[in-house]
Regions:
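Aromatic-lined, polymer-binding surfaces characteristic
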Residues: 2-57, 63-66, 74, 80-84, ...
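Structural helix-adjacent loops and short alpha-helical linkers that scaffold large soluble proteins
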Residues: 1-7, 51-71, 109-124, 156-167, ...
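Terminal, non-catalytic domain-edge segments
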Residues: 168, 183-184, 188-216
Length: 216
């Protein structure tokens, strides 16, 4: 039945999600990297999401169990990814960074799973890595995914910080010489598109609207 299927699914998340092996993810443009920290966050938030589903269904003991597992996974994540003033792209890769956009769900669900102000630390670090036309996806290349920038920006503590991420993105859309419908994959230094155009992922641009609706 559905419950058994979900239990098996989240059992796999707990077993393999903390420190992912060489798995596919949406940020593989520069190649596959095992131990992907953002992919690990996705698994952790999945476990937390299962806890929330159980809570809504009145399965309080199940909710508490999986909430505790997610909390412990998040604490371990913080230790594994810690690079001092930011967190790594992959657990075993020193001097790397990446957008941890999957962490937006921790903020939106008001769970506070990740300790030591992880979100605020990451957001502050990202602001030091921005180029003329936006924040790169990670430390490997200068290109970005603008839908993920919008998710990342939605983690900002206030509107002023949010706008610091949005202004370069607006500049890209307004000034790019690539005459295609909005591309969600572009170079942050030149403002030219890499690929993709007019895709449904542009819906991710409305993450701030969703976050405000859920939190207010």
């Amino acid at each position: 039945d559905t419950t058994r299927l979900l239990l098996n699914y989240y059992g796999l998340k707990i077993r393999f999600g903390q420190d992912p092996e060489n798995q596919l993810c949406t940020d593989d443009f520069a190649g596959h990297w095992a131990h992907n920290a953002n992919l690990s966050i996705k698994a952790i938030m999945g476990v937390a999401g299962y806890s929330e589903i159980a809570r809504i269904l009145g399965l309080n003991s199940v909710a508490e169990r999986y909430a505790d597992i997610a909390k412990k996974m998040a604490m371990k994540w913080e230790e594994m990814a810690n690079e001092g003033n930011h967190y790594r792209l992959a657990f075993d890769r020193e001097n790397t960074w990446s957008q941890k956009y999957n962490m937006i769900w921790d903020k939106m669900w008001d769970l506070n799973l990740f300790p030591n102000n992880v979100i605020d630390k990451e957001v502050s670090y990202y602001l030091t890595k921005q180029n003329l036309y936006g924040l790169p996806l990670d430390s490997r290349k200068e290109y970005t995914k603008s839908d993920w920038i919008m998710w990342t920006a939605a983690m900002s503590p206030d509107l002023e910080t949010f706008k610091k991420f949005i202004d370069p993105l607006y500049k890209y859309i307004n000034e790019t010489t690539s005459r295609v419908p909005i591309s969600d994959w572009h170079h942050t230094d030149s403002g030219e598109w890499v690929g993709f155009k007019a895709r449904s992922v542009i819906g991710g641009y409305w993450m701030k609207v969703l976050a405000d609706k859920m939190l207010n």
